[in-house]
Design a protein with these regions (language model features):
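Catalytic cores of enzymes that engage adenine nucleotides and/or redox cofactors via long glycine-rich
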Residues: 1-44
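Glycine-rich cofactor/substrate-binding loops
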Residues: 13, 31-204
Length: 204
């Protein structure tokens, strides 16, 4: 799943991140400009092989009577192959993550290209609680503003359209600042990273 996300984020039109690209490495034999995420692609492909092995293991469950050995031949293939594949995939995944290139300006550009639409859920909650209108009416207001933003972003982003709405005059600028603050999505980031296991510190 992580490698698939990296592949998606490395697309040319976004280029938010890139897996490590070694000097002299070729991304394509025919197109010298390409920097394909070959490691992430390889890991995604091997994950399909592992999925097939897992299916084989499930077929090994029903055995005849006390126990036959129909599972044995399959296990002799899937067990050593699976463990070797998992180790290889983990090592390559660690290499990709440790050397991942993050293009912050491209990330900001992609976020800005949404014209504030990614904050629609937060806007809905604020409109419902601060404007003292029903959730159904709040949803209709935010949705209409969002659809208009999709169609004509040059005439105003989502925030500008909501601030102009007559029914939302009770919502202050400070409230809108909080709604459209991208840092709000990082509120729990320390806790998320805290759940990631870290290798033990080697003894001196």
């Amino acid at each position: 799943r992580l490698m698939q996300e990296i592949r998606l984020l490395q697309r040319t039109e976004g280029r938010e991140v890139e897996e490590p690209f070694q000097k002299g490495q070729k991304g394509s034999s025919a197109m010298p400009h390409k920097r394909n995420p070959i490691l992430a692609e390889r890991i995604c492909g091997l994950a399909r092989v592992l999925s097939g092995y897992a299916s084989t293991a499930e077929y090994n469950i029903p055995l005849w009577h006390e126990r036959d050995i129909s599972h044995s031949g399959a296990e002799r293939v899937i067990l050593p192959d699976s463990t070797a594949l998992v180790e290889y995939m983990l090592l390559k995944s660690a290499f990709v993550v440790e050397n991942l290139q993050v293009h912050e300006k491209n990330c900001e550009r992609v976020l800005e290209s949404t014209h504030g639409l990614l904050f629609s859920s937060r806007a809905l909650l604020t409109v419902t609680s601060s404007a003292k209108i029903s959730r159904e009416d709040a949803y209709a207001i935010v949705q209409q503003a969002a659809m208009e933003t999709w169609a004509n972003p040059e005439q105003g982003n989502l925030r500008q359209r909501l601030e102009r709405h007559a029914s939302l005059s009770a919502i202050s600028k400070a409230d809108w600042d909080q709604v459209f603050d991208a840092r709000s999505f990082l509120t729990h980031i320390d806790g998320i990273f805290g759940r990631v296991p870290h290798p033990p510190t080697p003894s001196p």
